[in-house]
C-alpha cells in the first residue's frame, strides 16, 4: 500500500482514541475547558451514563461567534502561543485537541456567548462535518452537547462497560474535581435526576470533606502543610489504622491538576511503611505546588501523568513531609496540624501564630475510632505528671555492631516501675490511669471520657523500637570492610547507576567501584547488616536508584532488624503488671512517636466513649 495523507476526520478519530477513552474522558476535557474559562459553576447533564447525551453548561467567559469554528480545529487554542508558554503552562488544557477529537466521534453542538455580546451563537458538527455558525439565545458562558458518543466508531462503543460502571467513572472524576476546586459549584444529573451537588466552600471544612470523602476519612484526617526548596505540599493524610484494601482514596494534584505519579505514590507509601499493616494502602489528598517550569505536563495524551525536572528532590520532599506528619501523632492525643516549621527546619510559608488545624466536630464511637475528634492542642503533654525517665545512652547500643542480635536484647528498654499516679493530681492524661489488666494481654485505663484498652505487648514493642532507632541514629552508620572484596555481576545499566551514585552508596555504607562493563567490586558494607544478604540488598538499592532516584533499602533493612529486636525485648502476654507499671507504659505511649501502631502496623490501643458504653446498657433511653 503506498504512503498517503490521512483525511482530517480519520486523524481526529485516531486522536480521539488517545484522548476520549470513555464518557468520563469527555466530561473531564469539557469541564477542564470550563474551569480554564473562569467558570464558577458547571452543570453536567447525562443520559445513559453519557453514551446518549453529555451536556456541559458553564458561566465562564464564553467565546465570540467567529471563534466557534476555530475552537473545533486541531491545535487551535487560546492558552499558549510559544514554547515558553508551553513550558510554563498553568491551565488544565493547552493542546487544542479535545474538542475536535470529541466532535469526530459524536453528534456535537457548541453554544457560547460573551457577557458583552447581545446574543450567543451555535455551531453543530456531525461526524466531523462542520455546520454553519448561526445566532442563538444563550446566557453568558458556554454549553457543549455531545450526543451518541462513538456512534460512528462501533468497535469503540462495544468496549464500553455497563451503564452503572461508566457512571461510576464520571462520579469518581467529579469527586476528584471537587477536591481540587473548592470554589467551584458542580452539579451532576443523570437521566433527569440530580446525582451529585458540590457547593463551593472551604476545602478544609468539616462538611466538605465529609460530603466528598465520607465521615471516616474526615474524622481520621491529619493536616499537612509544609513548604521548602520552592515546593509546597498541603492537604490531608489519614491515620494508619484507616488504611484501605485498595488504593482507591489516593488523590494527588500537581499545580491543581489531578495526576498519577509513581514517584510520589512510592514516597507516600514509604513514609507509611513503619506503621501500615501489610497489604494495606494509605489514603490521602495531597496538593503539590511548584514553579510550572519545573514540571512537564505534556507527557501523556490525557495529561494523567507528569514528569518532574528534579524527581529525586520531589520524592524526598514528599517522603519527609508525610513521615514527619505521621511521626507527630502520639497515642491518646488529638493529631496536630503540621506546618512548615514542624518538619525539618523552617521554610517559606510558615504557619502564622495562632493558626490552628481544622477541627472535626463529628465523633464516632467504637474500637475502630482510635483518636476521637480532630483538633489542635497546644498544651504541653502531661504537665506536672511524673513519667518514666529514658536513661538509655547511645553508647549502650554500640554492641549492635559487635554482637549478634541475640546478645543485644537488653538494649530494648524494660518495663520500669513508677510511682502510682493519683487520679486527682492535675489533669487526666490522654490515655488516663490504669485500673486493671485483662487476661494478661490488655491494660484497661479510665480516661476523661470513657475507657481505654491497650495491647501491652504491641505498645511496648513500638516504644522499644522507637528508642532503638533513636539510639542507632545517634551512633550513625558504620561500615565493615570486607577482607576479600566481593565481585557482583550486574546489568550494564545498573553498573552505570553504581558509578554515577558512588557518593550515595557510600552514605549508605557501601564502598563500590566499577570493575568492568557489567561488574562491580564491593569493598565495604553496612556493619549492622553484615548478616542480611548484602549482595541482594545492594541489588535492591541499585534498582531503587535506577527507578526512583532514591532508596531507603538500607534504612528499611536496619529497621526490620531493630523491629525484631524490639519485639523480642517487649513485655510478653500473660505477664502480670502492677498498676504503676501499667501507668508507666501509658505515659511512655503518650511520649512516643507513632505509638498508635505496633511495628507491624496493628493498632496498639482503642477508646470506648462513655456515651457508647451507656448505649450498651440502654442508659438514658
Curated annotation (Swiss-Prot):
PANTHER family given in the database record: DNA MISMATCH REPAIR PROTEIN MLH, PMS, MUTL, DNA MISMATCH REPAIR PROTEIN MLH1
Family indicated by similarity: Belongs to the DNA mismatch repair MutL/HexB family.
Taxonomic lineage of the native organism: Bacteria, Pseudomonadati, Pseudomonadota, Gammaproteobacteria, Lysobacterales
Keywords: DNA damage, DNA repair
Biological process (GO), any one: mismatch repair
Protein name (Swiss-Prot/TrEMBL): DNA mismatch repair protein MutL
Listed GO CC annotations: mismatch repair complex
Species per Swiss-Prot/TrEMBL record: Xylella fastidiosa (strain M12)
GO MF terms held by the record: ATP binding; ATP hydrolysis activity; ATP-dependent DNA damage sensor activity; mismatched DNA binding
Function field: This protein is involved in the repair of mismatches in DNA. It is required for dam-dependent methyl-directed DNA mismatch repair. May act as a 'molecular matchmaker', a protein that promotes the formation of a stable complex between two or more DNA-binding proteins in an ATP-dependent manner without itself being part of a final effector complex.
Coiled-coil segments on the chain, per record: none
